[in-house]
């Protein structure tokens, strides 16, 4: 927070059992409770007070009978610019999205389609918002995708840019998780791409990554990225705003990145 001049946002996510148990080496247990504990401890830490916390997955200091017994409440040495740094939660599935809307400052969805996201997450967001502490303010939403702005991005050239997103979507929908425990595949199906999601996963897990990328629906590419002439992008941004998006998280492609961001700013302003 100090290095960025008070612009830092901390992002949390529970990922899935394949990554947590295969890469981090700990059981995938109580993921939502763990994230809530992390959020609570972080908020206590930033207030520069000695941290004493007892949650279902995190206890600070360690309880009596664990460790050496030498642990004691400590406080942070470095001073952040703010004592309430925004925490965004990257969540995808039902109860975790509800918990995000209740506890976090912001939400980081993936493959965000502003016209369809309510059919996937609407009920969960509403349930969490109903229990949200009013002092935390409105839930912030960060979404975007690739961005390329210009009259040249139509027809074949537009499709060439959108096709750049195919391998990444195929990786997540097809291979980011076990066959019966892939949250990204579930989201793709909830968007209405049931057959396509199954095909992507079948191809990816069989080693046909190119075929998996080719099976990504063209509509999904179109709706989850910002590629086209300025007028078209303006309409898309209006849809994002209507959906409640407060932060644009974009990857400039198809030209000079600085110029693309400047064009985006002009449209927003």
What are the language-model segments listed below?
Residues 1-269:
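Active-site-adjacent structural elements that line small-molecule/cofactor binding pockets in enzymes
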């Amino acid at each position: 927070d100090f290095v960025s001049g008070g612009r830092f946002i901390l992002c949390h996510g529970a990922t899935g059992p394949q990554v947590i148990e295969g890469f981090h080496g700990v059981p995938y247990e109580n993921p939502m409770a763990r994230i809530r504990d992390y959020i609570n401890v972080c908020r206590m830490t930033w207030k520069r007070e000695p941290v004493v916390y007892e949650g279902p997955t995190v206890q600070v200091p360690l309880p009596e009978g664990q460790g050496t017994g030498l642990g004691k409440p400590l406080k942070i040495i470095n001073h952040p610019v703010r004592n309430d740094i925004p925490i965004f939660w990257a969540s995808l599935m039902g109860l975790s999205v509800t918990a995000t809307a209740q506890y976090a400052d912001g939400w980081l969805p993936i493959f965000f389609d502003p016209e369809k996201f309510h059919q996937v997450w609407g009920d969960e967001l509403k349930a969490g918002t109903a229990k949200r502490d009013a002092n935390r303010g409105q839930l912030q939403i960060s979404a975007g995708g690739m961005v390329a702005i210009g009259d040249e991005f139509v027809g074949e050239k537009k499709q060439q840019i959108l096709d750049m997103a195919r391998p990444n979507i195929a990786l997540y929908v097809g291979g980011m998780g076990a066959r019966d425990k892939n949250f990204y595949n579930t989201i793709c199906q909830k968007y209405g791409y049931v057959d396509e999601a199954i095909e992507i996963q079948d191809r990816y897990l069989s080693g046909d990554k190119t075929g998996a990328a080719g099976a990504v629906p063209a509509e999904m590419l179109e709706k989850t990225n910002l590629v086209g002439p300025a007028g078209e992008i303006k309409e898309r941004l209006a849809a994002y705003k209507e959906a409640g998006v407060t932060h644009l998280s974009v990857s400039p492609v198809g030209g000079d990145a600085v110029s693309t961001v400047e064009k985006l700013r002009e449209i927003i302003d």
